């Protein structure tokens, strides 16, 4: 496709009878996954008051992440055995069943079981959405579909806490999970009616799911989650190290496996665009967790803003990502490499700006700093995903597509653990004075700059290799 054709692709081309119903179905699947964490954050305190289990509260998030990543890692193999439509229905059923388990739970261990099922269902749906966008739509539509996904995450950031908070305020926190279970059933109906049955070469005798490798991956996530749960000067860094080693072992096991590979072959090849692209996503996502976790608390304590105002700043970051993705989604194809370079560079600049402004005295400068980094993400996001998938061979596209949300979530998990270690090792506490909080705020962001620069380097290498491979 030439550049002039790419430039002519607009929203009118994608929001047609042929594509709109498919997009709406995929967006509903993303909504169920994206809103889940926000919903849980506002309903679980009421659940603890009702059924106890405060000591297990942090696991309601971690266990969902474990299930989500495991399911996302598996879908690249599952689509060889079955079509996307059938698999999405199955994962939506798992998600719905998880909602029912949480809604009926009488104690926190049962809630955790339901959360694991929700994670498996949501992670599977998310992985299949990334595969579906490369199978159901022309490649030039991918940036716009990614923009739709970004907007869905934005809506989830707004609505998820409000929905969960409303049910919790009314004293019926369980009803929130019944409502999301019903939404999962609506998704099943939409999938059945609106998504096509693929005429592909399915293999009923395809390779089995590699349980040992998936167990190694699960161990890596659990170790990272433990590191961020309760800080210990010795154990927390050790757990992060062991988590990274377990992740590296998983990658090595998969690379030498004779069958049932989860990852594309090129993921460890730094001379291939897939390897550099995936590392870009992993590292840059890792680097944004400091603000999401500690930004509101620091703004409240250091700048005296209300929790509502701090929440608005965080929402502004989400808005900037989403609107940037929307605005740049119609960019001509020959401009995409530039946007990947500029966007990844803005993430680094935004991180440095956050280190300087969050520890400063101006709230508006903090807002500007958050907008810089998040706009950079939105600017590059759809294009790097599109080009990673394009650079995959035909038999690797499913593995590559399902790897992308997994890389994102692994980055979030490791970033959260590292941010917790930095904050707690510097003594962040309720009793700190403003000067000490400024010191912590500075290092919470500047400490991630080397990793962000490395991610930026991989982004530039990706563009250079992508251009060579495309010619």
Task: Please place each PLM-identified region on the residue numbering.
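12-transmembrane solute porter fold
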Residues: 19-36, 40-42, 52-55, 60-63, ...
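Hydrophobic alpha-helical interface/terminus motif in multipass membrane transporters
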Residues: 44-47, 132-133, 167, 195, ...
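Alpha-helical transmembrane segments
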Residues: 24-28, 92-93, 151, 155, ...
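Helix-loop-helix hairpins in multi-pass membrane proteins, especially solute transporters
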Residues: 75-208
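Hydrophobic transmembrane-helix bundles of small-molecule transporters
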Residues: 169-279, 287
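Glycine/proline-centered helix-kink
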Residues: 41, 127, 148, 153-165, ...
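Intrinsic disorder in cytosolic terminal tails and internal cytosolic loops
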Residues: 1-18, 460-471
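N-terminal membrane topogenic signal
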Residues: 13-22, 208-210
């Amino acid at each position: 496709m030439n550049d002039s054709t790419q430039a002519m692709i607009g929203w009118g081309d994608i929001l047609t009878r042929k594509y709109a119903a498919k997009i709406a179905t995929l967006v509903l699947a993303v909504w169920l996954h994206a809103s889940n964490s926000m919903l849980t954050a506002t309903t679980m305190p009421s659940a603890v008051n009702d059924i106890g289990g405060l000591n297990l509260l942090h696991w309601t998030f971690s266990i969902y992440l474990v299930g989500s990543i495991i399911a996302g890692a598996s879908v690249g193999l599952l689509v060889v055995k079955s079509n996307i439509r059938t698999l999405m229905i199955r994962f939506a059923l798992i998600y719905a069943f998880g909602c029912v388990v949480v809604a009926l739970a009488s104690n926190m261990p049962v809630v955790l079981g339901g959360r694991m099922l929700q994670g498996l269902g949501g992670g599977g749906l998310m992985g299949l959405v990334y595969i579906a966008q490369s199978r159901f739509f022309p490649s030039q539509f991918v940036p716009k579909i990614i923009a739709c996904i970004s907007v869905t995450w934005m809506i989830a950031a707004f609505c998820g806490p409000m929905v969960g908070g409303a049910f919790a305020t009314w004293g019926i926190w369980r009803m929130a999970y019944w409502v999301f279970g019903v939404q999962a059933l609506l998704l099943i109906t939409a999938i059945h009616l609106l998504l096509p049955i693929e005429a592909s070469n399915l293999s009923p005798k395809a390779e089995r799911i590699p349980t040992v490798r998936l167990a190694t991956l699960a161990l890596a996530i659990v170790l990272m989650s433990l590191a961020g749960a309760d800080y210990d000067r010795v154990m927390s860094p050790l757990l992060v190290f062991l988590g990274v080693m377990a992740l590296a072992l998983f990658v090595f096991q998969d690379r030498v496996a004779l069958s049932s590979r989860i990852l594309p072959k090129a993921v460890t090849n730094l001379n291939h665009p897939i390897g550099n692209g995936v590392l870009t996503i992993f590292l840059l996502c890792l680097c944004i967790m400091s603000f999401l976790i500690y930004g509101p608390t620091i703004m409240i304590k250091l700048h005296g803003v209300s929790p509502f105002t701090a929440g608005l700043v965080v929402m502004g970051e989400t808005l900037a990502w989403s609107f940037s993705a929307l605005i740049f989604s119609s960019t001509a194809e020959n401009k995409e490499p530039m946007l990947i370079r500029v966007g990844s560079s803005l993430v680094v600049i935004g991180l440095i700006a956050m280190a300087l402004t969050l520890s400063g005295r101006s709230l508006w400068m903090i807002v500007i700093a958050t907008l810089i980094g998040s706009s950079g993400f939105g600017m590059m996001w759809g294009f790097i995903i599109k080009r990673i998938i394009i650079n995959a061979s035909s038999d690797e596209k499913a593995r590559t597509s399902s790897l992308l949300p997994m890389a994102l979530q692994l980055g979030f998990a490791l970033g959260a653990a590292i941010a917790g270690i930095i904050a707690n090792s510097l003594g962040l506490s309720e009793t700190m004075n403003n000067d000490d909080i400024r010191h912590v705020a500075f290092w919470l962001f500047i400490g991630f700059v080397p990793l962000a620069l490395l991610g930026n380097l991989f982004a530039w290498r990706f563009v250079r290799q992508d251009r060579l491979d495309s010619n």
